Structures are given as C-alpha cells and as structure tokens.
Amino acid sequence: MARYIGPKCKLSRREGTDLFLKSGSRALESKCNVESAPGIHGQRRGRLSEYGTQLREKQKVRRIYGVLERQFSGYYKEASRRKGSTGENLLQLLECRLDNVVYRMGFGATRAESRQLISHKAITVNGQTVNIPSYQVKVGDVVAIREKAKNQLRIAQALELCAQRGRVEWVEVDTEKKSGVFKSVPARSDLSADINENLIVELYSK
C-alpha cells in the first residue's frame, strides 16, 4: 500500500477529528471542516457498526503517525509480545519512532515534514546521521539537526509553532543548538485522550 499524498483535510474529515497533518500560521486551530465527512454528501455521516468503529480508530491512529498498514500490523504484533497493556505498548512504539520524536521536539511542523528531514539526512542520533523515519529512539538518545541544515527557515518556523502549542515533557530541547534529548517513554496518561487504543486491540483480537 502506497503512502497517501492527497488532500490532508480529506483524511481528517473522514475520521471526524483533526489529525494535525497540516501546519502553518493556523496550527493551533483546526484547519479542516471535520464536522462533515468528505465528498458531495459529506453531511451524511452514517452510523458505524462495532467493527466499523474499531476500524476507524485504527485508521485514525495510523494516519496520525503516518504509518502504513503493514508497518502498523508489525507494531501491533510487537506490542502484544511485550509485557503490560498491548494498547499502551502500541502507542509507545509509535511515539518512539524517530519521525515522531523529531516532531515532538519541534524540528518539524508536522510528522510528514519530520519524515522529510530524516529522509534528506538532516537528522542525527547520538552524532550519527539516521535517514530511517521508523528508527526506534531510546531513552537518553540525543536527536539533533545536522550543521548544514540548521539554518533552514522551515526548522525555525517549526520551532516557533512548537513554542506556541507547548512542548511535551518527555523531551528536552536546546533550541539554540537545535538538539534534544529523549528523556523518557511517555506514559499513557501523557498522550492524547482522543485515542481509544482498546478499540484497536479489540479489532486485532477478532
């Protein structure tokens, strides 16, 4: 399955919530009309079955983190093998992705922009260039912008947007040096309450 490159608002409208896929001066408010579904009959949002509700939740989380179907299934299998709550393990695996950590630190305005920075070899982990967006960041890892990319305007704009919305507590960032430390894996209570990971567990348990 190829990565979706169409209108970002269409995905948010389909899920009925802002997936924060877009950036810009209006980053602190929803830029999409999420009250109606996409298409000419968008106002008619039908009632979902139990399976449909579970599937929509999986698709929502997958799109928030920008993960393909096969990747997401792999994360679920890994989460189910670990001790503790499978749903919480799943979210933590997604949060530890390098593209997500770059976004959380404020170096990219969106996760998609963060993936692009990584693919263009603008990101280092512990001093080594890493160009794999799915790379799993570990506690204590230092994530930084490479020297040659530090003066990019989009990085300065992303840091400004991050300062407006507030940076998460599990990363520590030096905005002058454009580097940060992944201090801890976030607990479930630190993450969005808009995600119901139990629905995803129920879906995969069928």
UniProtKB/Swiss-Prot annotation:
PROSITE patterns: RIBOSOMAL_S4, S4. Gene3D superfamilies: Ribosomal Protein S4 Delta 41, Chain A, domain 1, RNA-binding S4 domain. It comes from the Bacteria. GO terms for molecular function: rRNA binding; structural constituent of ribosome. It holds the Pfam family S4. One of its GO terms (cellular component) is small ribosomal subunit. InterPro entries: Ribosomal_uS4, Ribosomal_uS4_bac-type, Ribosomal_uS4_CS, Ribosomal_uS4_N, S4_RNA-bd, S4_RNA-bd_sf. GO terms for biological process: ribosomal small subunit biogenesis; translation. The keyword rRNA-binding applies. The keyword Ribosomal protein applies. Residues 96-156 form the S4 RNA-binding domain. Keywords: Ribonucleoprotein, Ribosomal protein, RNA-binding, rRNA-binding. Part of the 30S ribosomal subunit. Contacts protein S5. The interaction surface between S4 and S5 is involved in control of translational fidelity. HAMAP family: Ribosomal_uS4_B. One of the primary rRNA binding proteins, it binds directly to 16S rRNA where it nucleates assembly of the body of the 30S subunit. Belongs to the universal ribosomal protein uS4 family. PANTHER family: 30S 40S RIBOSOMAL PROTEIN (PTHR11831), SMALL RIBOSOMAL SUBUNIT PROTEIN US4M (PTHR11831:SF4). This is Small ribosomal subunit protein uS4. It comes from Azotobacter vinelandii (strain DJ / ATCC BAA-1303).
